[in-house]
UniProtKB/Swiss-Prot annotation:
Substrate binds at residue 794. Mo-bis(molybdopterin guanine dinucleotide) binds at residues 83, 150, 175, 179, 212-219, 243-247, 262-264, 372, 376, 482, 508-509, 531, 558, 718-727, 802, 819. It is found in: Periplasm. Residues 1-31 form the signal peptide. Component of the periplasmic nitrate reductase NapAB complex composed of NapA and NapB. [4Fe-4S] cluster binds at residues 46, 49, 53, 81. This is Periplasmic nitrate reductase. It comes from Escherichia coli O81 (strain ED1a). GO terms for biological process: cellular respiration; Mo-molybdopterin cofactor biosynthetic process; nitrate assimilation. GO terms for molecular function: 4 iron, 4 sulfur cluster binding; electron transfer activity; iron ion binding; molybdenum ion binding; molybdopterin cofactor binding; nitrate reductase (cytochrome) activity.
Length: 828
């Protein structure tokens, strides 16, 4: 066959990526070269992180056989990371689930039984019985769902409707609680609206990049490649990287800073002090667009109320704040001197000053990037607020090339978990369940009785674990997440509840994960391009894809599972009589009729799909389900600064960044000339706040929930590696990625290893107050912790590092701190 220059370049890109990771050229590259004419290509966003790279998916004979970077995608411009090039192989692991599995003994369900294949009708029969029994005996608070930032937009929306409107339970929360909740609360406190004001286009215009607790080189490698290009092509560009240990992003750093865990709060306040002391405040911006408030302190650690740390806290969980003057704020940050900061953080003074100068220099455009180092933090909301302070003091915000930017880790943590409102306290478009007006808006749009949606906030992720253990949450459905491996404190707070005979656990997943194997019922799930989908990435870019192949066996999408299960419930079985009396026409209808087969959702015919276009759910139901759900959902944000484009526009584009007004996307929010919601002459308007002003918060340093002592003498930090994504349930089934990083290791400083008579390659027992795991000593490699700290990734199901972690959370966001707990080591 003829091989075009473009095909040759694509194949070489794959080969180069494989070579960079020390791998042989995969079949993906060979497919591009050898079968170009036989492969059908279509676009999709990548299945992995929140960057939102565009890929071209190659299908042949009903299978995904190839994948390449989409040269027309503005995010990645044709480049993929090593995981992206192996996307086809995540779908075809040898142990892919193809039929429902129920624990059974002697032909019926048994908590201690063996997993046995059953039909979907049988699976729904058991689920129906468990849900109806719990609802009848204990009410809506006895059921719950744990969802995902990997749900498609309409899957998250359908789940939220089913639980909040159908079952009248706000006990639905996404795994984004573990990664982005602190960012959400930080945005809401400072700006009154969620999500970043900038976009990836800032990279090519910035003068300085500051990474706070973010290893972009491995976790957001495509964005890092753009930063690297910017840094290496302009000698005046500066990169600063802050972390508790050295990692691959330090290789590009002009100023690489290692600080004592938790002391990032000190550094942030020091920089604010430096800006004020050096008269570097942008007075015009500051005087017009900023308010000052002092936040409540000593707010606890989100542990059980009986925990000594919670009992000792003066203001546990308090989000309170009060106005303060500039002079009071100036005096507050003045305590964070250079000398004090250097002492508390362990960072040399010259490095601190260099960092502060970047923010203070009025001629430098600065972008602050952060991910889990800030968010998975018992003061994660504060850390978010404090970095916003720096940009608000200097006016370096909402303009090309400068601004604070919270990066996301999952493909639709923004588009689904946050924007749709699948958190236990949220509704679509930044609305919340505690606000009567917001509930009323949803109830009217959904045509359900007033008072249907509960006003009480539901159980967040960690609270769900505790309620399961305590026997208060009895039916629990998890989708598109592996929380038994990814969540904190497995031994004490999660496993007991999952295996409690009072509780029934359902896991929907493509593979037999740690979570699935701990459940009672496993539902086989369609993944990625086996369904039509939509994700929203970190820069507010919403991206669609078509179903391109069918799922194996009886595997069904999460959307299908939710919608079909809703047929099992009539309104009389889930709503009290006083609600039905308000809308008697809904009596006798199923939740499917009320929530999904409504005139609003079902008005788009299947004929809108091309004749040969796959869409299993819509063709089965007889209407274009995804379009109906999306257009209903999009209504909530239009006209309110969350405007999404019409459904069909997304299938034509490589994503659009909201707000999309009059067909035009928005790159920079809150600034005149960029944001359609900011009028001429306003300059800047932070319209999430009633007065249009953002808030600078005065917030102090407070210590971690658990720190090393004489017995448990090391800090433990957990995280990811380039080759694997989250718990590895997809990437470890790709042979090439598995070979590249086959098992987790314990990264440790050579002197700490030597002091414990440990050598590289030794087996070592890592012990905390909550559990222990066996790992392998690594004194070299990509991650280089300082003395006193060890680092361990969580992708390895054979080394469940979250047996060790503490379920301490930020009291405001309820997000777990996976970066700081105390451990000791024992040689095996």
């Amino acid at each position: 066959m003829k091989l075009s220059r473009r095909s040759f370049m694509k194949a070489n890109a794959v080969a180069a990526a494989a070579a960079a990771a020390g791998l042989s050229v995969p079949g993906v590259a060979r497919a591009v070269v050898g079968q170009q004419e036989a492969i059908k290509w279509d676009k999709a966003p990548c299945r992995f992180c929140g960057t939102g790279c565009g890929v071209l998916v190659g299908t042949q004979q009903g299978r995904v056989v190839a994948c390449q970077g989409d040269p027309d995608a503005p995010v990645n411009r044709g480049l993929n990371c090593i995981k992206g090039y192996f996307l086809p192989k995540i779908m075809y692991g040898k142990d892919r689930l193809t039929q429902p599995l129920l624990r059974m003994k002697n032909g019926k369900y048994d908590k201690e039984g063996e997993f046995t294949p059953i039909t979907w009708d049988q699976a729904f029969d058991v689920m129906e019985d468990k849900f109806k029994t719990a609802l009848k005996e204990k009410g809506p608070e006895s059921i719950g769902m744990f969802g995902s930032g990997q749900w498609t937009i309409w899957e998250g929306y359908a789940a939220s409707k089913l639980f909040k409107a159908g079952f009248r339970s706000n006990n639905i929360d996404p795994n984004a609680r573990h990664c982005m909740a602190s960012a959400v609360v930080g945005f809401m406190r400072t700006f009154g609206m969620d999500e970043p004001m900038g976009c990836y286009d800032d990279i090519e215009q910035a003068d300085a990049f500051v990474l706070w607790g973010s290893n972009m080189a491995e976790m957001h490698p495509i964005l890092w490649s753009r930063i690297t290009n910017r840094r290496l092509s302009n000698q005046n560009v500066t990169v600063a990287v802050l972390s508790t240990y050295q990692h691959r992003s330090f290789e590009l750093a002009d100023n690489g800073i290692i600080f004592t865990p938790q002391s990032d709060l000190v550094i942030l306040n020091y920089i604010a002090n430096y800006i004020i002391q050096n008269n570097a405040i942008n007075q015009d911006f500051f005087s017009k667009h900023v308010n000052l408030r002092k936040g409540a302190t000593d707010i606890g650690y989100g542990l059980r109320p009986t925990h000594p740390l919670e009992k000792a806290a003066k203001n546990p969980g308090s989000d309170a704040s009060e106005p303060m003057s500039f002079e009071d704020y100036k005096a507050f940050v003045a305590e964070y001197t250079l000398e004090k900061t250097a002492e508390m953080t362990g960072v040399p003074k010259d490095q601190l000053e260099q960092l502060a100068q970047l923010y203070a220099d009025p001629n430098k455009k600065v972008i602050s990037y952060w991910t889990m180092g800030f968010n998975q933090h018992t003061r994660g909301v504060w850390a978010n607020n404090l970095v916003y302070n720096l940009h608000l003091l200097t006016g370096k915000i909402s303009q090309p090339g400068c601004g604070p930017f919270s990066l996301t880790g999952q493909p639709s943590a923004c588009g689904t978990a946050r924007e749709v409102g699948t958190f236990a306290h949220r509704l679509p478009a930044d609305m919340v369940v505690t606000n009567e007006k917001h509930r009323d808006i949803c109830e009217k749009k959904w045509n359900i009785p007033s008072g249907t949606i509960p006003a009480k906030i539901g159980l967040h992720a960690v609270a769900q674990d505790r309620a399961l253990k305590d026997g208060k949450l009895n039916v629990y459905w998890t989708m598109c997440t592996n929380n038994m491996q990814a969540g904190p404190n497995i031994n004490e707070e999660r496993m007991p509840g999952w295996r409690d005979p009072r509780n029934f656990i359902i896991v929907s997943d493509p593979y037999p994960t740690v979570s699935a194997l701990a459940a009672d019922l496993i539902l086989p799930t369609a993944m990625w391009v086996e369904k039509e989908g939509a994700y929203g990435n970190a820069e507010r870019r919403t991206q669609f894809w078509r179903q391109q192949v069918q799922a194996p066996g009886e595997a069904k999408s999460d959307l299908w599972q939710l919608v079909q299960f809703s047929r099992r419930f009539k309104t009389e079985e889930v709503w009290p009589e006083e609600l039905l009396a308000k809308k008697p026409e809904l009596r006798g209808k199923t939740l499917y009729d009320v929530l999904y087969a409504t005139p609003e959702v079902s008005k788009f015919p299947v004929s809108e799909l091309a004749e040969d276009q796959l869409n299993d759910e819509s063709r089965e139901l007889g209407f274009y389900l995804q379009k109906g759900l999306f257009e209903e959902y999009a209504w909530f944000g239009r006209g309110h600064g969350h405007d999404l484009a019409p459904f069909d526009d997304y299938h034509k584009a490589r994503g659009l960044r909201w707000p999309v007004v009059n067909g035009k996307e928005t790159q920079w929010r809150y600034s005149e000339g960029n944001d359609p919601y900011v009028k001429a002459g306003e300059g800047y308007k932070f319209y999430g706040k009633p007065d249009g002003k953002a808030v600078i918060f005065a917030l102090p340093f407070e210590p971690a929930a658990e720190a090393p002592d004489e017995e448990y003498d090391l800090w433990l930090s957990t995280g990811r590696v380039l080759e694997h994504w989250h718990t590895g349930s997809m990437t470890r089934r790709v042979p090439e990625l598995h070979r590249a990083f086959p098992e987790a290791v314990l990264f440790i400083h050579p002197l700490d290893a030597k002091a414990r008579d440990l050598r590289r390659g030794d087996k070592v027992k890592v012990v905390s107050r909550r559990g222990e795991v066996i790992s392998i000593v690594e004194t070299r490699g990509r991650n280089r912790p300082p003395q006193g700290l060890v680092y361990m990734p969580f992708f390895d199901a054979a080394q469940l590092v979250n047996k060790l972690t503490l379920d301490a959370t930020d009291p405001l966001s309820k997000e777990t701190d996976f970066k700081k707990c105390a451990v000791k080591l024992e040689k095996v």
